[in-house]
Regions:
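Non-transmembrane, aqueous-exposed alpha-helical and coiled segments at domain scale
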Residues: 1-423
Length: 423
């Protein structure tokens, strides 16, 4: 068998959690390959909204095995609360969730380092979620980090202490005023570590490759979005991991030739949380309406998302970098009621019109060029077939397909798993 990938093509918050939930029944294993609790995957069904931060979105399906891969960074405290939330709904976590021993741990001092580093940047801050993600990945690449497998070692606490002391020295170097009680944070951390020990740790690269040999199907689930990729995103306003398709191979230990389909998820408009370039951002009532109707607030941070028109230049870039084979468009229902819709098809950059992302994509350097499309009035939330969609939306979809060269296979018309139309 092969592995299919599911990725976000924008700046995150595209709706990946819902689509994983919809697709899970087709797969034996759902595997998360990068990121940490800075991202929230939102799922809604039976009138209840669920937000997952580290655990794969397949956990709600009783026949699926869920893997947290080696490319993920885990905060035991956040993870413990996530487990407790699932247990309230009698979700069987114990037998269906396995964690890679090679996944790195977020320490309390990683979170403090994150806060100190961001505070020291002043106006140049990048909009970090302050969850300790960046410092943890820094320790990983610097070969200083602690991994899940280290929990099983007799000298784990000594290893923790040595690393935490290094962090405190670094925090003091920043000379910022942080209010914290490290003793309380550490007590909470080690309590969560004891709970983490109750779960199954695995060598996930061996587990997944053996599963492929046995003919099992795997869906690799990404976090954040392609435009936040550490290499290919709008650097330095990016996350600390590879959110693109290549990250699935390194984050799970699977070979590139095992990958079959790549599903790219994108909103029918564009959003972004935090700082960074956003060429099609709206600052008027239209943007405010998108935010209100789309309930555009971060599922983890609660921060308001910036909203703007669909950027096809950026979308095509993400499609190409990921080798996307099928597109899933989300939140078309949010655009219902707009008389006209704008779609960005190129940029004005240094006196020229270009159709690719430039190296320096600062707002003052890039101006979007729009094509205007007719909007639709119809409420989409109750529709169940592609034929029932308004002609204007179908034309919108066709325009996107022709521009990026990849078919749109799914149209989401609401947050519930049932509000998903297969084309």
């Amino acid at each position: 068998m092969t592995v299919d990938l599911l990725l976000g093509l924008q700046w995150g918050d595209e709706g990946k959690g819902k689509i994983v939930d919809v697709l899970t029944s087709k797969y034996d294993i759902i595997a998360r390959f990068q990121g940490g609790p800075n991202a929230g995957h939102t799922l809604e069904f039976d009138g209840i909204k669920h937000v997952l931060r580290t655990i794969p979105s397949g956990i709600f399906h009783k026949n699926s095995i869920n893997i947290i891969g080696n490319g993920v960074v885990m905060d035991p405290v956040v993870f413990q609360k996530e487990i407790e939330g699932l247990q309230k709904f009698n979700i069987d976590v114990q037998s269906r969730l396995f964690i890679s021993r090679k996944a790195h741990l977020i320490l309390p001092t990683h979170r403090l380092l994150d806060a100190a580093s961001e505070a020291a940047k002043g106006k140049a801050k990048i909009g970090s979620t302050l969850k300790g993600i960046g410092p943890t990945y820094m320790d990983k690449t610097g070969r200083n980090g602690l991994r899940v497998g280290d929990i099983e070692l007799v000298d784990f606490k000594e290893r923790y202490k040595a690393l935490a002391e290094k962090h405190i020295e670094m925090i003091d170097f920043y000379k910022v005023d942080l209010q914290y009680n490290l003793a309380e944070m550490e007590e909470e951390f080690f309590t969560a570590i004891e709970d983490l020990k109750k779960l199954t740790f695995i060598d996930s690269e061996f587990y997944l490759n053996q599963a492929l040999k046995e003919g099992k199907s795997i869906l690799a689930e990404g976090a954040q979005g392609s435009l936040l990729d550490i290499d290919f995103g709008t650097y330095p306003f990016v996350t600390s991991s590879n959110t693109t398709a290549a990250g699935a191979c390194t984050g799970l230990g699977i070979a590139p030739n095992k990958v079959k389909d790549v599903f790219g998820i994108f909103k029918a408009y564009t959003t972004r949380v935090g700082s960074g370039p956003f060429p099609t951002e709206l600052f008027d009532e239209v943007g405010q309406t998108m935010a209100k109707v789309g309930n555009e607030f971060g599922s983890v941070t609660g921060r308001a998302r910036r909203c703007g028109w669909l950027d096809l230049v950026a979308l095509k870039y993400a499609v190409e970098v990921n080798g996307v084979t099928a597109l899933y468009t989300m939140k078309g229902d949010v655009l219902s009621g707009f008389e006209t819709l704008n779609i960005c098809t190129s940029y004005k950059y240094k006196g020229e019109e270009i159709d690719h992302l430039p190296y320096n994509i600062e707002e003052e350097n890039v101006q979007p060029v729009f094509v205007e499309k007719k909007g639709w009035k119809q409420d989409l939330t109750g529709l169940t077939s592609y034929d029932a969609l308004p002609i204007e939306l179908k034309e919108y979809i066709t325009f996107i397909e022709e521009y990026v060269g990849v078919p749109i296979k799914v149209v989401s018309v609401g947050p519930d798993r049932k509000q998903t139309i297969m084309k």
